[in-house]
Amino acid sequence: MTVGIIMGSKSDWPTMKHAAEMLDQFGVAYETKVVSAHRTPHLLADYASSAKERGLQVIIAGAGGAAHLPGMTAAFTSLPVLGVPVQSRALSGLDSLYSIVQMPKGIAVGTLAIGEAGAANAGLLAAQIIGIHNPEVMSKVEAFRAKQTQSVLDNPNPAEE
């Protein structure tokens, strides 16, 4: 596995599956796991501290509410951690965004947008990071970007179907 996709609870999967789907497009291997910062802190510590030795290169961590998972993951590993705020009913994910983005100096978490777009972009960003040293993955990322560009160029008039 190259990327770890972790989430605070199973209910976060409808959001986090978009990271997995993006990684599938680029042929990047990943694992998925529920790892709660609050309910299973020892599991989190074990998961994050062993990630590099297990072959992971990037960890995508999605969480809602207090959203301590990405920051605590980053505290236990030197790997890049990408945080995805999961949208909640109470505050629409803003609480999660603030929890993830406001990390203290010295413990970095790359924070993405709230919800589905953030999860998909976390998958894309993970592929870009891996692509730095993997030409095959980078080629697929570049083809993805070119396809997006061509789609806009092929449909410049919003009034046409």
From Swiss-Prot:
This is N5-carboxyaminoimidazole ribonucleotide mutase. The gene is purE. It catalyses: 5-carboxyamino-1-(5-phospho-D-ribosyl)imidazole + H(+) = 5-amino-1-(5-phospho-D-ribosyl)imidazole-4-carboxylate. Belongs to the AIR carboxylase family. Class I subfamily. The keyword Isomerase applies. Pfam families: AIRC (PF00731). It is an enzyme of class 5 (isomerase). Substrate binds at S9, D12, R39.
